[in-house]
Structures are given as C-alpha cells and as structure tokens.
Amino acid sequence: TPSSQFTRAPQATDGCVAVANPDLERIIRTVEIRTTPVLIGKNLSWVRPDKLASQKKQFSETLQTWTNAKRNGRENELLQFYASDFSADGKDLNSFSMSLRAELKRPGSKPASLKDISLIRWSDEADTMVATFGEIPDGEKVGRTVRQYWQHRPGGWKIIYEGLV
C-alpha cells in the first residue's frame, strides 16, 4: 500500500490479503515468519484446547498410522489415506502415487519421523484439518516441511492435498 494510502479499496488486492502498514509491522514483530499460521474467515470461534482433546487424539492416531505406513514403505496402505479427488501441484492421485512409489523405493532413502506438528481444524462445507510438520529422515538434523489438507469423509480422514512449505 502506498504510504499516502492507509487502506485499499475493496477488491483492489486481486485475491491477495492486504494489511495496513501498522498492522503488518505488529505482525512482523509478533509472529515467527513461515511457522505461524494465518487464519482468514468470516466467523472464527476459538475453542478451549481441553474441549478438543479427544478429537486431536483421534486425528493424531490417524496421522501416526500414515507415518508408520510411510516409514515402513507400505505403499498400498499409505495410498489408502489419499482421497480419490486428491490434487497437489497439478498432479492428480494417479500421478502423485507414482511419485510417492518412486520416493519409497529410492535407494538410500531413510525412514522419517515427524517433528513440530501443527494442526488446524475447521468446518464449513467440509470438516477439514491442516497438518504441517517437519519430516526428518532418521539420523539427520533437518528435513523438509510438509503441509497436508485432510477432510473427514465416510470411512475416516483422507488427504486431499499434500505439498512442501
């Protein structure tokens, strides 16, 4: 935003989020860039963590089962976690599954553990969970940061998107 203009006209951002300079300066001082999630919505309702404990436990068990399937190279079990309408970076489930199979069979690839798991859940048209985590190969100190979008579907949670942050 130009310094002479405090706010932008409605719909002048072409789909981007516009924040007034003083607010942006406060955000920069307050949050850790690339690790603090930003939620944008019409109606946000904060819920006490203890009210969500059982739901978090149930989803965490699902995520751990996904992790175990990937760690152990069980590709058929792993692919059961992905929704039929999955898409990621222009790949449908079929294309993505070929990449995933190649990753699992790559010589020298090490099993990985999840670290710094962040979960954000909301319900609008669908019950959605965003899981962001570090995927650290065993014996390494650093890895990659993965973000997955899961939706609760008949039969359980399914991944509808997966990509690197």
Can you annotate each of these PLM segments?
Residues E140-V165:
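Short beta-strand edge/turn micro-motifs at domain boundaries
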Residues S99-R147:
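Surface-exposed, charged secondary-structure patches
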Residues R34-T36, E75, G156:
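Loop/turn elements at helix/coil->beta-strand transitions in domains of secreted/extracellular proteins
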Residues D23, V31, K42-L44, Y82, ...:
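A mature extracytoplasmic/lumenal domain signature
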Residues T1-Q64:
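Exported/periplasmic cell-wall-interacting domains
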Residues C16, N21-I28, S60-L63, T67, ...:
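Extracytoplasmic/secreted envelope proteins and their assembly/folding machinery
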